[in-house]
């Protein structure tokens, strides 16, 4: 596990207002959280001349008033930052991601490996697009590497209706 202070040490997802996810989506979420906690890069830049308390950080993700909310606290629970991102830039990518995931889950049950691999490559491409969008939207608020962005995008998909 990464022991850097520039990381997430806890992740909470507030999905209380959402219908239960499918078993496949729930599994993706569990894997993303596990992988994030094992290895991630999450840095908060100083803002307006203020120092940022050192990490590691706890992240609470939620959707409130049609905005994606990142609520950041220190490991001990002291609030550090909260920022809201418009869901608009994510909607089409999330929709595309859900559609390709459905195709992938269906393909795994009935198609030959070559066709499954082609669908999986498309799925990864859409996933990467979502991760890059997240990195762009976080600019000036938080810095994450591409692997962290990919895993966070998986969690965002759990919060945004596809």
Swiss-Prot record:
Record's superkingdom?
A: Bacteria
Listed InterPro entries: UCP032146
Residue ranges for the region (Disordered) are: 1-22
Q: Which family does it belong to?
A: Belongs to the UPF0262 family.
This protein is called what?
UPF0262 protein Pden_1958
């Amino acid at each position: 596990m990464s022991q850097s202070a520039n990381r997430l040490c806890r992740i909470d997802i507030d999905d209380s207002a959402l219908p239960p996810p499918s078993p496949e989506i729930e599994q993706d979420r569990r894997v993303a959280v596990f992988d994030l906690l094992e290895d991630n890069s999450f840095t908060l830049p100083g803002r307006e001349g203020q120092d940022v308390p050192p990490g590691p950080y706890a992240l609470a993700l939620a959707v409130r008033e049609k905005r994606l909310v990142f609520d950041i606290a220190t490991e001990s629970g002291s609030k550090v930052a909260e920022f809201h991102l418009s869901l608009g830039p994510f909607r089409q990518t999330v929709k595309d991601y859900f559609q390709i995931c459905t195709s992938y889950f269906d393909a795994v049950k009935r198609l030959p490996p070559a066709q499954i691999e082609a669908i999986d490559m498309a799925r990864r491409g859409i996933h990467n697009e979502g991760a890059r969008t997240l990195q762009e939207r976080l600019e000036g608020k938080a810095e994450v590497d591409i692997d962290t962005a990919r895993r966070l995008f998986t969690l965002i998909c759990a919060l945004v209706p596809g």
